[in-house]
Amino acid sequence: MSRIVVLGAGESGAGAAVLAKVKGFDTFVSDMSAIKSKYKEMLDRYDISWEEGQHTEELILNAEEVVKSPGIPNDAPIILKLKKQGTPVISEIEFAGRYTNAKMICITGSNGKTTTTSLIYHIFKSAGLNVGLAGNIGKSLALQVATDQHDYYVIELSSFQLDNMYKF
């Protein structure tokens, strides 16, 4: 069984962890901050190991791949160590994209992302399409892919979410 480590346990990280677990990965989540109770409950429900308030290197550096939440800088010490040893570090969006055949409409840019994303989602939903809303608004893409597959996803992507995307 492959080992996936998820760094950050907010909406993005918790969703990525659930998807990893559902797909059969040995999954571990680490967050330097306190994890909100709703995400702890989600991780516990899926029997996912987690830690908060630290990044225990021996539990992280043995990952075959790491899913990094967008709030963690690429120059964080643990990220630099992972990259130095050659461990792939990817985004939640990149990870989730591997497990869906849905069509994805992604919106990025400086201004108007949320409005544009919401408008497109509303148009699709009003047309009766099976559509999910993800990214900076709505549930994480990974959580939706794990729990309620859609035919379409409308995704708002910040510049931070574009980091660590390679094949999406």
What does each of the following model-derived ranges do?
Residues 58-61, 70-168:
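Phosphate-binding loop of NTP-binding sites
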Residues 1-91, 95:
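N-terminal leader/targeting and accessory segments in enzymes
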